[in-house]
Structures are given as structure tokens and as C-alpha cells.
């Protein structure tokens, strides 16, 4: 089981060993499956970012991500980042999580997925704020197999 917060900041290496950038964010598709990684690559005016499709990631280790070639890096305008973990138009981080009875469980602090098998989200780490995290710790909400019982709202 891997978490998104661990991936952010990791170097992205090409197969030849050169560094292509660092992971800045993770992009999701319309079904909230991991679809791409957003690179923090030095661009002067920052109107565009580089992204790599998750299918082009050759290896996802504890210390780095490896992609096959520079050709898999694609430049996209920053305003086209729709669903991401922390920097897009719709951010998964800090979204509130409610039960079907309307009780708030907390806010999303991290996301868990199975790295080698697939890109489906398998759980969330929830926070109630800094003091609650310090005194009580964060809670994990591990999803049952499949995402039938989970619905993500607009806000």
C-alpha cells in the first residue's frame, strides 16, 4: 500500500539515470483513479507544467519514480489541471468526508493506493486539524473492495 503524500517530492528519473524533475502533485481521472504525475520542473513563468501518464511510470519505488524516456513527458497548461491531490481546480486534499447520516468524519489528508497492481484509491487518511492529529492521531478510512459505497461531491 502506497500513499500520495510519500510520492510528492520524490525525484522522477529517466531510464538512463538523469533526473527529469520531482513529483509536485498527482492527477486523477473522472473516476478518481490515479492518471498522471505532475512534475515540478523549472519553467521560467510557470504557465505550464509537465505531466507523465501513470501508465508510463516504469517503477514506483520508495526513493524515486522511473520513467522510460523523456518522450513521455508532456507539457500541459496549468489551468488544464482538473482533478489533482493538492494543486488543481478540484483538489482532493482537505475535502470533507461525511457518512450517509451527515456526520463529518474529517478532511482528506492523504490517499492510499496499491502501487504495482493499479491506480484505484483504496483508502483515505482523515484529519480533524493539527491539535487533534497531535493528541489523537489521524484516522484511516480503508474502502471495501470496489468503490460502490463511495461518492465524491462537487465541493
Question: Language-model segments: which ranges?
Answer:
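Peripheral interaction segments used for macromolecular assembly
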Residues: 1-155
Amino acid at each position: 500500500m502506497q500513499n500520495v503524500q510519500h510520492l510528492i517530492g520524490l525525484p522522477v528519473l529517466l531510464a538512463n539515470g538523469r533526473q527529469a524533475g520531482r513529483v509536485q502533485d498527482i492527477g486523477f481521472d473522472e473516476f478518481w483513479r490515479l492518471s498522471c504525475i505532475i512534475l515540478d520542473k523549472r519553467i521560467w513563468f510557470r504557465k505550464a507544467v509537465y505531466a507523465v501518464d501513470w501508465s508510463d511510470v516504469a517503477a514506483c519505488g520508495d526513493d524515486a519514480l522511473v520513467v522510460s524516456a523523456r518522450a513521455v513527458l508532456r507539457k500541459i497548461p496549468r489551468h488544464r489541471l482538473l482533478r489533482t491531490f493538492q494543486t488543481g481546480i478540484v483538489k482532493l486534499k482537505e475535502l470533507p468526508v461525511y457518512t450517509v447520516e451527515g456526520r463529518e468524519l474529517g478532511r482528506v489528508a492523504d490517499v492510499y493506493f496499491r502501487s504495482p497492481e493499479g491506480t484505484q484509491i483504496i483508502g483515505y487518511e482523515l484529519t480533524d486539524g493539527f491539535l487533534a492529529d497531535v493528541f489523537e492521531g489521524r484516522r484511516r478510512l480503508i474502502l471495501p473492495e470496489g468503490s460502490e459505497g463511495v461518492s465524491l461531491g462537487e465541493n
